[in-house]
């Protein structure tokens, strides 16, 4: 049984009493109706009449309810408004832009949205307008991506374990299903939960109206290495949990979610004529003259890294000074939260190499010490593991069932004083870190899958470990190190495929190296803007391989802007 995929085309019929959504390419599919002003959902098998406005959209982002408290009438009188009359808006994607293909699946970027009110407001509420403005700004500025046929929220390795007969939204990783909360009304209605009226039971026809959206960075580029055609892909998925901005969100919450958690997946796709970015980067040889790797099998090689704040209770309190006040609660109080966090990380990724890049001196030393203390506390305590949530991708257990080691023995703490090692613009010394991680990188491996002619993926190898990198912000130092690990793994993958010979490196191909550096620097900027409001620091090193004084001056400007 084939899965129900989201509609690629939706028409909206708007009237004073409802919004009706239908797909012109699927005339036999039921129409989704959202009644106004109640917000009740229903499916209609017939044609609705009376719509005053008909428009075409790319998809439904979700339904959001903003609470109204005190409002102002037309005469200026202040008046209380009950929750029953709270404003709700249907958020729709009015414009999207194709930005590349992966294995034949078109990927889109959200360009513009519209907030369609369920209630015509007679009162003006300044708080409501403020919340609405904030939300519109977030959606407008945030890079969001989606596909009608490809799951962007899951790594290739997790996709290989998914049930392809499930609707796209049910396969999505809950952490990276960015619009999951605003889709709650649609999902509840689909699952048969009442929507303001007696439930009619599960409504599988709603599946086609639920479109998972990912927030983060996406780059797909057709390129080559030493004349061998490939598609280079870099995806960073930002977690929807604890997704606040820099000084407003640090550390972990009670559920074990950490600030600025991102999963970055670097992919190489070989022998896939259906994959193509909108731009190619083939160097002097040109795209048309590149030679395919021997064999016709479409191969996917993937390598996943993560980043996230140190999982204890800590904060930086704004005191109007450039350096805010650092506060860290007792480590014992964070044990439950940290264990929840690492339980999930171990289940999902296997061995965790906890790469800590904060300074060993000064104010950052307290964060370093806290991380080391919480890790030691977990490894020395009796294990009380938290049960996996089968509704999320925690069902993907990387650890073998017969592994007899202690649960938290899968955590491997690695410290590298990044600033001290690279001071004086000696950034080449960051390569010393590879010596500390090499054994773990080799043992953890990467994902390698080959498409079967009958469909599905023949998994040749799995990635069984992840490097979880952090600095204070999990931005600038983290970006430099992650790109370095990505390059090292890419070289290993291409050697294993026979594209490179032992002793050669991907960076020996200058055209590809230029592409690689710029894609990773773009990734750094996207992650940084989402968390700090500015582009990343130290990207001159990522883009060129050298730390420059001009880059240092640009970093100073960005630091002032962040403050």
Q: What feature does the model see in each segment?
A:
Residues 1-460, 489-563:
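Phosphoinositide system proteins, centered on phosphoinositide phosphatases
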Residues 465-484:
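A phosphate-binding catalytic loop at a beta-strand-loop-alpha-helix junction
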């Amino acid at each position: 049984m084939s899965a129900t995929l989201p509609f690629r085309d939706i028409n909206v019929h708007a009237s004073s009493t409802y919004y009706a959504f239908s797909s012109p390419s699927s005339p036999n599919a039921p129409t989704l109706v959202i009644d106004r002003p109640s917000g009740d959902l229903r499916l209609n098998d017939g044609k609705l009449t009376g719509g005053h406005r008909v428009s075409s959209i790319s998809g439904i982002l979700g339904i959001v309810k903003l609470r109204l408290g005190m409002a102002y009438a037309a005469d200026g009188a202040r008046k209380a408004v009950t929750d029953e009359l709270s404003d709700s808006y249907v958020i729709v994607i009015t414009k999207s832009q194709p930005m590349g293909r992966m294995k034949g699946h078109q990927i889109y970027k959200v360009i513009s949205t519209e907030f369609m009110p369920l209630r015509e407001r007679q009162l003006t509420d300044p708080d409501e307008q403020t919340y609405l403005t904030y939300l519109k700004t977030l959606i407008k500025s945030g890079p969001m991506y989606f596909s009608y046929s490809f799951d962007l929220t899951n790594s290739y390795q997790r996709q290989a374990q998914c049930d392809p007969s499930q609707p796209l939204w049910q396969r999505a990783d809950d952490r990276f299903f960015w619009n999951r909360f605003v889709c709650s009304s649609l999902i509840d209605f689909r699952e048969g939960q009442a929507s303001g009226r007696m439930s009619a039971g599960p409504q599988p026809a709603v599946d086609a109206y639920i479109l998972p959206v990912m927030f983060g960075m996406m780059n797909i580029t057709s390129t080559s290495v030493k004349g061998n055609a490939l598609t280079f892909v870099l995806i960073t998925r930002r977690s929807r949990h604890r997704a606040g901005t820099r000084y407003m969100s640090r550390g972990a919450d009670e559920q074990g979610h950490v600030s600025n958690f991102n999963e970055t997946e670097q992919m190489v796709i070989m022998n896939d004529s259906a994959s193509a970015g909108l731009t190619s980067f083939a160097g002097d040889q040109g795209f048309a003259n590149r030679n395919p790797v021997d064999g016709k099998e479409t191969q996917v090689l993937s390598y996943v890294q993560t980043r996230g704040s140190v999982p204890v209770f800590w904060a930086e309190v704004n005191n109007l000074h450039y350096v805010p006040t650092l506060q860290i609660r007792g480590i014992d109080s964070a044990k439950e939260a940290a264990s929840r966090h690492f339980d999930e990380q171990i289940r999902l990724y296997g061995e965790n190499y906890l790469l800590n890049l904060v300074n060993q001196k000064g104010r950052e030393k307290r964060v370093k010490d806290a991380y080391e203390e919480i890790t030691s506390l977990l490894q020395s305590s009796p294990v009380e593991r938290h049960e996996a949530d089968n509704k999320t991708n925690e069902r993907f257990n990387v650890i073998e069932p017969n592994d007899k080691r202690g649960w938290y023995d899968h955590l491997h703490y690695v410290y590298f004083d990044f600033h001290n090692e690279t001071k004086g613009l000696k950034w080449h010394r960051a390569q010393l870190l590879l010596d500390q991680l090499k054994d773990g990188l080799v043992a953890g491996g990467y994902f390698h899958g080959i498409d079967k002619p009958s469909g599905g993926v023949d998994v040749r190898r799995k990635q069984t470990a992840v490097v979880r990198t952090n600095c204070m912000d999990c931005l600038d130092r983290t970006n430099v190190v992650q790109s370095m690990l990505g390059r090292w793994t890419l070289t290993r993958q291409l050697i294993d495929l026979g594209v490179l010979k032992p002793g050669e490196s991907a960076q020996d191909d200058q055209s590809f190296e230029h592409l690689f550096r710029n894609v990773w620097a773009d990734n750094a900027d996207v992650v940084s803007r989402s968390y700090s409001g500015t582009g990343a620091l130290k990207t001159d090193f990522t883009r060129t391989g050298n730390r420059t004084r001009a880059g240092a001056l640009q970093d100073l400007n960005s630091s002032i802007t962040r403050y």
